[in-house]
Amino acid sequence: MPSFDTVCEASMVDVKHAVENTTKEITTRFDFKGTPAAIELKDKEITLTGDADFQLSQIEDILRNKLTKRSVDVRFLDKGEVQKIGGDKVKQVIKVRNGIETELAKKIQRLIKDSKIKVQAAIQESKLRVTGAKRDDLQAAMALIKKDITEVPLSFDNFRD
């Protein structure tokens, strides 16, 4: 029975390279000289450190540009709150989304059921598997998901015929 998986995964290699390129640019830019401006990637969290909110926004802008150049959708980034870490330094943690949240998976599942396309959607941990009898039905389901779900960057993997 034909099937495909709907996933929400960023290429962590490209994210790592974008963070490294951002670090290089921070060290060479004149307006960041002598400041504690830094960016760091640990697991799936990017930590921005700087003197003020304005500096954090500049670092984030550089990061977004580098991610865009590497074809990583910036909707993968989930910004946290700006925290004061002593003195006049601030930091912000940005999480890189990986996997479809349960709430979104249920929304997609409901969307597919309501569309009356002859496919079934099953939630499997951080992805959503869609199965159907015909390949055309699966392609219609893909088109429906792409059209209606725009808040997160979804991709389709593991298409089996």
Curated annotation (Swiss-Prot):
Record organism: Albidiferax ferrireducens (strain ATCC BAA-621 / DSM 15236 / T118)
Pfam family, one: DUF520
Function: Nucleotide-binding protein.
Family named by the database record: Belongs to the YajQ family.
Signal sequence interval, chain numbering: none
InterPro entries in UniProt: DUF520, UPF0234_N, YajQ-like_sf
GO CC annotations on file: cytosol
Name assigned to this protein: Nucleotide-binding protein Rfer_2692
Keywords annotated in UniProt: Nucleotide-binding
One of the record's GO molecular function terms: nucleotide binding
